[in-house]
Regions:
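Bacterial Sec-dependent N-terminal signal peptides
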Residues: 22-45, 74, 107, 113-127, ...
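Surface-exposed binding patches on compact interaction domains or structured appendages
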Residues: 36-39, 43, 59-88
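Terminal, contiguous helix-loop blocks that mediate binding/assembly
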Residues: 255-507
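Catalytic-core segments of thiol-dependent peptidases
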Residues: 171-190, 197, 201-299, 310-311, ...
Length: 507
């Protein structure tokens, strides 16, 4: 016998049927798509020259059209449909002014009128706030690393770090050939354009280097210039005879200054293929620091900074040679792993403040933090420092007084100096401060030295991992951030150091 439903059950049944009906009705209704129109950027920046192009992407739910105000630029296309469309903007004229120029704007609207967007168009000034040069002379076994460095730079540029500043890359593809290219930002990507190709290059000659930088000044003029130099490095040591010949390596003696090198520190490769970096590529194709200084002086440039992506270039002898062509030297007193600087991390700091400035703290910190973790536990080695070149001559005056007041340096076997390489015998590079502390016992002079060292190589920029790499991990027990060859008994040092500007200024 079926029991009659109570009023409560009837209410529950009816409620469930009503909910089911509403759900089915909602599922059958067609969902109306919300009208939308977006652009990848609200400002397009054209380079300063006529014909330069920049792009942005339009994403739309329906047909759209574009109108412009202002002038001095062309746009294509001016309409599109559903989906994504790339719009290209082209400069009609050069911007000959010294400031960014507002050319106009583009108004985009859906055909239904339900959404719109505006993109402004500006043109970079004829003279950039800064131009950074990535200088990569032929360095043999580092070429593939240079290509990786450039790819890392492109990652940074794709983040729109340049703004109105410019970045050019000089890259040698062989001992005699090379090219000059500009990297720039466009629509979320890094693009490049070739500015010039070179044949029969000899970058060991001052005239060649001057010619390269004269062209850069002409093509990418700027209020300020910075440069990164990637290659193998050997501090101030003359290009001729900078390495050890095979016979010398076996005999444990140093070659004469004119010996053609056959064995270099970067040729000591670890079992898993790791090696390090020299300012040049070996033998007669290396560039002396004095030659580079002569060339840049002739080009009429004083860099804001020279960032050496090379071994041993944080050297007081090097700093003295280059003091008049740069405000700062960013370098390592020891070897740099062949990978070099992590440019995807470093480049944003070289284009700080909207591309107009640079952040030395950020550069040093990003280098240090990268190498703290680099291929641990065998190769997490790195050291960096910044030398203030305007303080180098004052440091030379202090050092001259110390030399005049001190007897000749005699090594103390109980207190070995902090050395920065272990592949040449005798060692060529030692920590400057450690050397001075053992050379001089005059308290007043040492206090003066400490104070001047703090101004010349500021402590906040002296960063290093626990070890540096030189044929293996080597401990850092004291670190002033800068080396000297003064205490070295190496033949190449003894035969040449008295010809350096630093030696002449301090003796």
């Amino acid at each position: 016998i079926q029991q009659p439903e109570t009023p409560y059950l009837q209410i529950i049944r009816r409620t469930l049927w009503l909910l089911l009906a509403v759900t089915l009705l909602a599922g059958c209704e067609k969902t109306e798509e919300r009208a939308g129109l977006t652009t990848t950027q609200d400002e397009v920046v054209l380079r300063s020259t006529a014909g330069s192009e920049a792009a942005f992407t339009v994403s739309s739910t329906e047909a759209w059209s574009l109108t412009t105000t202002g002038g001095g630029f062309d746009v294509s296309p001016t309409r599109g449909g559903r989906g994504e469309t790339t719009v290209t903007v082209r400069a009609q004229d050069d911007n000959t002014t010294t400031r960014r120029k507002a050319l106009g704007s583009m108004a985009l609207r859906l055909s239904s009128g339900k959404a719109e967007a505006t993109v402004s168009v500006v043109q970079s000034p004829a003279v950039a706030p800064q131009t950074v040069v990535m200088y990569l002379p032929w360095s043999g076994n580092l070429y593939t690393h240079f290509l990786q460095n450039i790819e890392d730079v492109k990652k940074a540029v794709a983040g729109n770090i340049l703004r109105d500043s410019r970045l050019v890359v000089f890259l040698q593809t062989s001992t005699t050939k090379g090219s000059l290219r500009e990297l720039y930002y466009d629509n979320g990507e890094c693009r490049e354009t070739e500015l010039r190709t070179y044949e029969n290059l000899d970058v060991t000659q001052a005239e060649t280097i001057t010619g390269i930088f004269d062209y850069i000044k002409q093509t990418a003029p700027a209020e300020r210039y910075g440069i990164t130099i990637g290659s193998h490095g050997m501090a101030w040591i003359p290009a001729s005879g900078s390495g050890r010949s095979t016979a010398d390596a076996k005999a444990g003696t140093e070659p004469a200054a004119t010996t053609v090198p056959e064995k270099w520190h970067w040729e000591y490769v670890s079992p898993d293929g790791q090696f390090t970096r020299w300012f040049g590529d070996g033998g007669s194709r290396c560039t002396n620091t004095t030659t580079f200084a002569e060339a840049i002086t002739a080009a009429g440039i004083r860099f804001e900074y020279i960032l050496f992506d090379d071994c041993f270039m944080s050297s007081i002898e090097v700093a003295y040679d280059l003091r008049k062509i740069t405000r700062y030297l960013i370098a390592s007193p020891c070897e740099v792993m062949a990978y070099g600087y992590p440019y995807d991390l470093v480049m944003p700091y070289l284009f700080a403040d909207g591309g107009t400035g640079y952040d030395l703290d950020g550069v040093c910190r990003s280098f240090y933090e990268f190498y703290e973790q680099y291929e641990a536990p065998n190769y997490n080695c790195g050291a960096i420092a910044v030398t203030v070149c305007d303080q180098v001559e004052t440091m030379a005056e202090v050092m001259r007084r110390i030399n005049n007041a001190s007897p000749a340096y005699i090594p103390d076997p109980e207190k070995p100096l902090q050395q920065y390489e272990y592949l040449y015998d005798p060692t060529r590079f030692y920590d400057l401060a450690d050397y001075v502390y053992q050379l001089c016992d005059d308290t007043a002079l040492l206090k003066e030295f400490d104070e001047q060292l703090g101004r010349t190589v500021p402590e906040r920029y002296r960063l290093h991992t626990e070890y540096f790499y030189s044929g293996g991990k080597r401990p850092i027990t004291t670190y002033s951030g800068i080396s000297t060859s003064a205490p070295s008994t190496s033949g190449i040092v003894v035969n040449n150091i008295q010809n350096t500007g630093w030696y002449k200024a301090t003796h």
